[in-house]
Amino acid sequence: MRPVIVKGKHVQVMSSSKREDGEVRSAKTMDRDIVSNAFKQAVLKLNPKQMIKNPIMFVVEIGFFITLLLSVVPSLSTNVPLWFNITVTLVLLFTVFFANFAEALAEGRGKAQADSLKQSKKDVYANIVKENGEITRVLASNLKKGDMVLVKQGEMIPGDGEVIRGLASVDESAITGESAPVMKEAGGDFCSVTGGTMVVSDEITIRITSNPGESFLDKMILLVEGATRQKTPNEIALNTVLISLTLIFLIAVVTLPLFTNYLGFQIDTSILVALLVCLIPTTIGGLLSAIGIAGMDRVTKFNVLAMSGKAVEAAGDINTIILDKTGTITFGNRMAHALLPVGNETIEQLAKWAALSSVLDETPEGRSVMDYVQSKGFSYNVSKEEIGEFVPFKAETRMSGMDLKSGEKVRKGAVGAVIDWVQSQRGKIPTDLHQKADLIAKEGGTPLAVAAGNRIFGLIYLKDTVKPGMRERFEQLRQMGIKTMMCTGDNPLTAATIAKEAGVDEFVAECKPEDKIAVIKAEQELGKLVAMTGDGTNDAPALAQADVGLAMNSGTAAAKEAANMIDLDSNPTKIIEVVAIGKQLLMTRGALTTFSIANDVAKYFAIIPAMFTVAIPQMEALNIMGLHSPLSAILSALIFNALIIPMLIPLAMKGIAYKPMSSNTLLFRNLLIYGFGGVLVPFIGIKLVDLVVGLFIS
């Protein structure tokens, strides 16, 4: 608590506290319970009604039923032994099972996180405050939007809401995993509270902002469980390509008997089924859903809640990131560093009016002005009775201050805004005002002009600090081909100094909320995808306009509703990690698609020569792998085709290693590793399986 002396009386002002990000809560990929449940779900997903959602694996399951029939009724298959049909049937079953297991494992990790969130969702009693002041206790599940609720120290906040009265410390660890409490108070951008969190000091009155079942925690549980997950546009497009390839191979395999009959020999149905399954892209088909689910899970592990997979994918395609200066690029704790009187005014006069404009200002800047004035020993003699109405800062006016009961008005704020305010009252502007303001700006500070009536008394020098490592992070984004833009309400000189120090590509000075929307639209008109962060109600329109809008959990309900991602740690710089995760998701999908198609090329060289060697002896020259026999070649390729899916599950879950580099370098690297590797690995794998299979085939 800090005392502010006003003519011998004390006004207590609570100091704010800033928490650091908590450790990320996550479920291990191979947790025993998750794996056990994934096995059960993989079996349940064998239901054709479930399998039809994945057309590629549905084709494999149809093949399983065909070979199962051939195994049960051997007379339908006369060209191959019964053991071959049974083996093919089992391998196809495991192929489908492994694909289902990958998806169930990814979903299981989300469900484990959802279970921990459900533990925070308890039906407690709430103290409803009626219009006449009477307090009634009801179950939290009976609260409706608009209800006023009193929450005291030690009580759980019964539902989502906004603080309308009071100030308190709130423990949000049940939601964010961060143990340090955060301050919540009426007004401003930090009035939003979440149901399931607990008040640890003082008391607050909140207005409920959601009906039962519509709270933030309810939405989190649904999203983390994947109940609302839909396929993203990129996923749908890739699925369309894979289905097209499957249809092409299906037509080729169905018409193949016409060709073999012409050559004078017949191919058994089970061999045709095995050939089809080996040629269609089953690897990526079996892992595609798991990759998408795991991508959202990786975002969740960073304590970021993505409203859809589309938002995560969009983050991977981002071209421009728009960042607020305060709290994102800089620490955001601009503190009063000096007082500079202008014209013929004295520093004592400036100190008096600076303090008067800040005595009821609960912002960090306002409190720092009071601290500075008191630390320098300045005094002012204003009775508490003379203090009138506080004028809060607004983005439109860019000023705050107080209207005294005597009729005098005092303001502090952006130099340009205060000049306009003074000139509107026919006041004169000191000749050295701009010179001193420019001096502060060139040093990277922020000048706030102080005026009373139609006189400007001087400047408050606010100083902020760029967060360490920001220049390096922006350089990484530049290597990824992403442009960074800084938006700030500071004047152009201050903005330019901070931008140069931080290493951002462009900046927008004296930026108002509507300016952010204009900047976003301008970038989008150039065909670029834009990401931005925000926490205030005035950020909501821009968050909605951006392709990726990351809202802070500590921000207002309007900001969180407008955004498509919410950072539970309220760390604006996390947008950079979100972009990296999005790119990793797209790269993982692309790399495994490349690997899957390259696999098909290798399997082609394993199966086709073996199938036609009997009828066309010259095909033996293409049997470069030296496989044991035609049946061994087909089984080896089919077994490898099944085993590669579980072998790639950890990579699909974790994502491929990502380092910032140019698109061309990235493409060459992935083609080399996953294209060439996708051809080489099957040659080695199929040969090893053939050596084992050959031991059982005479």
Curated annotation (Swiss-Prot):
What cystine linkages occur within this chain?
Answer: none
Q: Which GO terms describe its cellular component?
A: plasma membrane
**Which membrane topology describes this protein?**
Multi-pass membrane protein
The residue range of the signal peptide is none
Main EC class the enzyme belongs to: translocase
Q: Which residues form the active site?
A: D324 (4-aspartylphosphate intermediate)
TM regions (residue ranges): 56-76, 82-102, 240-260, 271-291, 605-625, 633-653, 677-697
The EC number(s) attached to this protein equal 7.2.2.6
Q: Name one Pfam family in it.
A: Hydrolase
Chain positions recorded as ATP binding sites: D361, E365, F393, K394, A395, E396, T397, R398, M399, S400, K412
UniProt binding sites for Mg(2+): D535, D539
* GO MF term list: ATP binding; ATP hydrolysis activity; magnesium ion binding; P-type potassium transmembrane transporter activity
In which compartments does the protein localize? Cell membrane
What is the protein name given in its UniProt record? Answer: Potassium-transporting ATPase ATP-binding subunit
Species name: Bacillus cytotoxicus (strain DSM 22905 / CIP 110041 / 391-98 / NVH 391-98)
Designated gene of the protein: kdpB
